Amino acid sequence: MRFRFCGDLDCPDWVLAEISTLAKISSVKLRLLCSQVLKELLGQGIDYEKILKLTADAKFESGDVKATVAVLSFILSSAAKHSVDSDSLSSELQQLGLPKEHATSLCRCYEEKQSPLQEHLRACSLRVNRLASVGWRVDYTLSSSLLHSVEEPMVHLQLQVVPAPGTQAQPVSMSLSADKFQVLLAELKQAQTMMTALG
């Protein structure tokens, strides 16, 4: 069977397996869990202490807690990516075996944060990392046994790259001849023009 929140594909087996785990907790606690997972998806961080307290009554092991967070994260982010409305999501989750009040509770939480979640996912998609800053300097070598001509300029670039949101910037250094720098600059401008057109 195909589901819209899975991109009109079959639901992954691991998600099917975890639906029964979600049914073990109350619908109120499921809603509170969803709000924590949505905070994580929106880049605001997750409170694992709160999650452990919410799942304590169901006597979840650490693997169950992680699986619960993972399945909620998958359902919410996948539904947002595929622009599924909350009524359709509720219906599909009930088809997978999630009790109606649990599905309603999850979908109410999803509906409240659907727009900001889609905006955040759009901003993060197709990004490997972000450029925090660029430093550069040009050196003129007056004489060297390695260079063919005297006074050939060298461009030294220092990029500060943030690999993922919330992580420290890492330096990436490179040295280029003036010719190679001109080629790099032209290609970067061309890429920027193409990205702006996609916009």
Swiss-Prot record:
> Where is the COMM domain positioned along the sequence?
130-199
Q: What is its main location?
A: cytoplasm
Source superkingdom: Eukaryota
Q: Which InterPro entries match?
A: COMM, COMMD4, COMMD4/6/7/8
Location(s), subcellular: Cytoplasm; Nucleus
Which keywords does the record carry?
Answer: Cytoplasm, Nucleus, Transcription, Transcription regulation, Ubl conjugation pathway
Q: Which residues form a coiled coil?
A: none
Question: GO cellular component terms?
Answer: cytosol; nucleus; plasma membrane
Q: Keyword Transcription regulation: yes or no?
A: yes
**Pfam families in the record, alphabetically?**
COMM_domain, COMM_HN
* Function summary: Scaffold protein in the commander complex that is essential for endosomal recycling of transmembrane cargos; the commander complex is composed of the CCC subcomplex and the retriever subcomplex. May modulate activity of cullin-RING E3 ubiquitin ligase (CRL) complexes. Down-regulates activation of NF-kappa-B.
* Family designation: Belongs to the COMM domain-containing protein 4 family.
User: Quaternary structure?
Assistant: Component of the commander complex consisting of the CCC subcomplex and the retriever subcomplex. Component of the CCC (COMMD/CCDC22/CCDC93) subcomplex consisting of COMMD1, COMMD2, COMMD3, COMMD4, COMMD5, COMMD6, COMMD7, COMMD8, COMMD9, COMMD10, CCDC22 and CCDC93; within the complex forms a heterodimer with COMMD8. Interacts with RELA, RELB, NFKB1/p105. Interacts with CCDC22, CCDC93, SCNN1B, CUL2, CUL3, CUL4A, CUL5, CUL7.
What name does this protein carry? COMM domain-containing protein 4
State the organism named in the record: Mus musculus (Mouse)
